[in-house]
């Protein structure tokens, strides 16, 4: 049906042969016999298919007459579910009601208006066959022929990530496959290997742009210190009038460097790619452990980053795309394997080596604490030296040489400048906040390890791993929000 000739029908069959085909599980209570004929059982199966398609697509294509309908699994209900996450008779009303009042980047529908070959099959009032437009939940513009700006930006971010992966493909291949470090991991099902591969790309790119951002910060604050020093010499020391030109040259260099960093979007890419990598890490280990979402047919991380900027929806879209696939068959001794996940993801705080997130967060916390102590010590040192210099000037007053007095005055200007620059640099990197976050995450993983040690069976272990993953995703969302509030700036210069 739907084809005007055998040639079109054959073309469709050839196209269908290129697709990956997999079966969704039967809805609870359904059998193959009960869905063989039209009826409530088959409608529930269609509703499940609708939920799966909606949960794993970036843009829902709806060939629809625009008329509302209460038929379960029908196009009208699929569109409604995609925009509200509510499907009467299937999803609980309160569980997803918050989708109705939040910016939800997965609500976009592209409708092609069509009629039905039956009496009364014309499109809804005001619509004509073959019209096409985007449907959104925006009450001010529910229909638009142009892709809304927020979604355009979101898809642009996806394209930029794909371009970066292609650009650095050779280096990515040479990077360490952190999720596939042993023979057991390489025996995992293909879908999990695909997630590990995407993680490898996102992790490499995040580290690549992190180096650029941190280099940019160090250079910027070094320039700020040098500019301050140049101005002090220009203003307070005779014979250094040319320092004003040094000041301007340093400022110009910093401005050019800042313009390059902003144009190439270094910080945004570093933050986005790091959060994508950490989301994929959770997704990978959940699947290896056999942890499924509470409604396994839906996308497991549908709330990840939902409270942040809609622009960040591209991260969830990437995770959504790589999660598409059939339910994997168990591989004895390999998959599902909660024990493997506990060892590789969580790790052991008492074991040697660097395996697991417990050891990672401990190392990061110790490193940030040392940096914080250095910043505090520098501030105190500068304070006391400044007080000492002030006392010397006050006590000796006119009894010291003019050249010595000039040096002391310069020192009084340089010391607080150095302390201020170091403090600003630490604030920009959010060192204090990260110490607290790393301490929290380290305790979180240690507590999870303790709970897993007394779990009675794999089901209890999966419950703990699910809770741990959800908490980790929440913390990653807080991390990106914290750093987005500290953008690269030229104002310090």
Regions found by a protein language model. Give the residues of each.
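Acidic/glycine-enriched connector segments
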Residues: 1-130
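Generic intrinsically disordered, low-complexity segments enriched for polar/acidic and small residues
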Residues: 9, 19, 43, 130-131, ...
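Extended low-complexity acidic/polar segments
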Residues: 123-143
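Conserved non-transmembrane functional hotspots
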Residues: 136-493
């Amino acid at each position: 049906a739907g084809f005007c000739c055998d040639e079109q029908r054959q073309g469709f069959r050839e196209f269908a042969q290129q697709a990956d085909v997999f079966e969704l599980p039967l809805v609870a209570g359904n059998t193959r016999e009960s869905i063989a004929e039209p009826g409530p059982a088959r409608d529930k199966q269609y509703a499940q298919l609708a939920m799966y398609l909606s949960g794993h697509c970036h843009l829902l294509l709806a060939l629809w007459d625009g008329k509302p309908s209460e038929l379960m699994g029908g196009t009208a209900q699929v569109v409604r579910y995609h925009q509200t996450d509510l499907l009467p008779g299937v999803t609980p009303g309160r569980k997803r009601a918050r989708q109705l009042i939040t910016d939800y980047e997965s609500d976009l529908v592209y409708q092609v208006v069509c009629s039905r070959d039956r009496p009364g099959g014309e499109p809804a009032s005001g619509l004509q066959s073959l019209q096409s437009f985007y449907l959104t939940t925006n009450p001010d513009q529910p229909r638009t022929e142009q892709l809304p700006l927020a979604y355009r930006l979101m898809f642009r971010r996806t394209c930029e990530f794909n371009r970066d992966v292609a650009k650095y493909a050779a280096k990515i291949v040479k990077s360490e496959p952190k999720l596939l470090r042993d023979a057991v991991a390489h025996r995992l099902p293909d879908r999990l290997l695909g997630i590990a591969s995407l993680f490898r790309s996102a992790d490499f790119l995040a580290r690549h742009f992190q180096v650029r951002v941190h280099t940019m910060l160090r250079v910027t604050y070094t320039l700020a210190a040098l500019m301050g020093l140049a101005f002090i010499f220009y203003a307070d020391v005779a014979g250094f009038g040319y320092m004003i030109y040094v000041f301007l040259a340093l400022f110009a260099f910093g401005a050019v460097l800042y313009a390059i960093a902003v144009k190439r979007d270094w910080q945004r890419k570093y933050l986005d790619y790091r959060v994508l990598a950490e989301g994929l890490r959770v997704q990978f280990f959940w699947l290896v452990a056999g942890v499924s979402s509470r409604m396994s047919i839906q996308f497991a991380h549908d709330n990840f980053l939902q409270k942040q900027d809609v622009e960040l929806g591209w991260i969830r879209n990437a995770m959504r795309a790589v999660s598409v696939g059939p339910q994997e068959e168990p591989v004895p001794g390999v998959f599902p394997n909660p024990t493997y996940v506990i060892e590789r993801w969580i790790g052991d705080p008492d074991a040697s080596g660097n395996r697991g997130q417990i050891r990672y967060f401990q190392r990061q916390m110790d490193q940030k604490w040392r940096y914080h102590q250095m910043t505090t010590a520098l501030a105190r040192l500068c304070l006391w030296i400044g007080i000492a210099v002030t006392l010397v000037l006050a006590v000796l007053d006119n009894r010291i040489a003019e050249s010595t007095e000039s040096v002391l005055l310069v020192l009084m200007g340089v010391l607080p400048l150095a302390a201020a620059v170091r403090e600003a640099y630490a604030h920009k990197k959010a060192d204090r906040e990260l110490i607290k976050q790393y301490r929290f995450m380290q305790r979180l993983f240690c507590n999870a390890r303790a709970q897993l040690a007394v779990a009675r069976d794999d089901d209890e272990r999966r419950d703990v791993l699910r809770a741990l993953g959800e908490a980790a995703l929440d913390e990653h969302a807080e991390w990106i929000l914290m750093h987005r509030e500290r953008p690269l700036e030229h104002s310090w210069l």
